[in-house]
Swiss-Prot record:
Subunit note: Monomer.
Keyword Protease: yes
InterPro entries: Peptidase_S1_PA, Peptidase_S1_PA_chymotrypsin, Peptidase_S1A, Trypsin_dom, TRYPSIN_HIS, TRYPSIN_SER
Tissues expressed in: Expressed by the venom gland.
EC identifiers of the protein: 3.4.21.95
Keywords noted in UniProt: Blood coagulation cascade activating toxin, Disulfide bond, Glycoprotein, Hemostasis impairing toxin, Hydrolase, Protease, Secreted, Serine protease, Signal, Toxin
Enzyme class, UniProt record, top EC level: hydrolase
Signal sequence residues: 1-18
Protein species of origin: Daboia siamensis
GO BP of this protein: proteolysis
Reactions mediated catalytically: Fully activates human clotting factor V by a single cleavage at the 1545-Trp-Tyr-Leu-Arg-|-Ser-Asn-Asn-Gly-1552 bond. Cattle, but not rabbit, factor V is cleaved, and no other proteins of the clotting system are attacked. Esterase activity is observed on Bz-Arg-OEt and Tos-Arg-OMe, and amidase activity on Phe-pipecolyl-Arg-NHPhNO2
The protein's name: Factor V activator RVV-V gamma
Residue ranges annotated for the Peptidase S1 domain, each copy included: 25-251
Lineage: Eukaryota, Metazoa, Chordata, Craniata, Vertebrata
Propeptide: 19-24
Length: 260
């Protein structure tokens, strides 16, 4: 694979995400204000609307989905309520963006990962702290947590003032393969959700973290429409498979290749 630093937005990639262009947590409740210091909100200078989420992994780097890229993107850290500001909230802009170019599957949707270097490092505080990258892969049955400011209703365009959280489980990949043609069996993705339905990421949650045992194991990539349907779990980029790529980019190695 070839590593490229993309300065233009990924228009084709974005248009391909009809299922969950940006997602929110359906079937969840308001997150505890202190449980998501790593959660960031992505928006643009032209709009205050949150179109995606992401996660802070150190003072200078944020991990999110490639299809969340926009021109003039802004990253807000330390936020809980959209309307009541935390004293330690900070806003940053990108210094650089890094992607994996997918040559095996032209639409690139099975490598939905973007690493953003911030123009200025953040200051850690009560509501701003990094999440750990995965130390090992998590298997089927692992309980994980999803969170975001995304849509909370499957029938109405209802978006919360505060992030919502809920627990889901990693399920067998076979549940996702027939639902999403861009998720082949050998893709580096996780399939996760509640098979009976009712709990899911949704529009506005894309790019946000899948947290398992305190580590970021997934990035919200895509799913069904409407969200939270019976036997229709969602797809998450498998962060563990990109650990070496992420650490190499952070260390300054711009020639590192993405996992095949």
């Amino acid at each position: 694979m070839v590593l490229i630093k993309v300065l233009a937005n990924l228009l084709v990639l974005q248009l391909s995400y009809a299922q969950k262009s940006s997602e929110l947590v359906v079937g969840g409740d308001e997150c505890n204000i202190n449980e998501h210091p790593f959660l960031v909100a992505l928006y643009t200078s032209a709009s205050s609307t949150i179109h995606c989420a992401g996660a802070l992994i150190n003072r200078e780097w944020v991990l999110t989905a490639a299809h969340c890229d926009r021109r003039n993107i802004r990253i807000k850290l330390g936020m809980h309520s959209k309307n009541i500001r935390n004293e330690d909230e900070q806003i940053r802009v990108p210094r650089g963006k890094y992607f994996c170019l997918n040559t095996k599957f032209p639409n690139g949707l099975d490598k939905d990962i973007m690493l953003i270097r911030l123009r200025r490092p953040v200051t850690y505080s009560t509501h701003i702290a990094p999440v750990s990258l995965p130390s090992r892969s998590r298997g089927v049955g692992s309980r994980c947590r999803i969170m975001g400011w995304g849509k909370i209703s499957t029938t109405e365009d209802t978006y919360p003032d505060v992030p919502h959280c809920t627990n889901i489980f990693i399920v067998k990949h076979k549940w996702c393969e027939p639902l999403y043609p861009w998720v082949p069996a050998d893709s580096r993705t996780l399939c996760a959700g509640i098979l009976k339905g009712g709990r899911d990421t949704c529009h506005g949650d894309s790019g946000g973290p899948l947290i398992c045992n305190g580590e970021m194991h997934g990035i919200v990539a895509g799913g069904s429409e409407p969200c939270g349907q019976h036997l229709k779990p969602a797809v998450y980029t498998k962060v563990f498979d990109y650990n070496n790529w992420i650490q190499s980019i952070i260390a300054g190695n711009r020639t590192v290749t993405c996992p095949p």
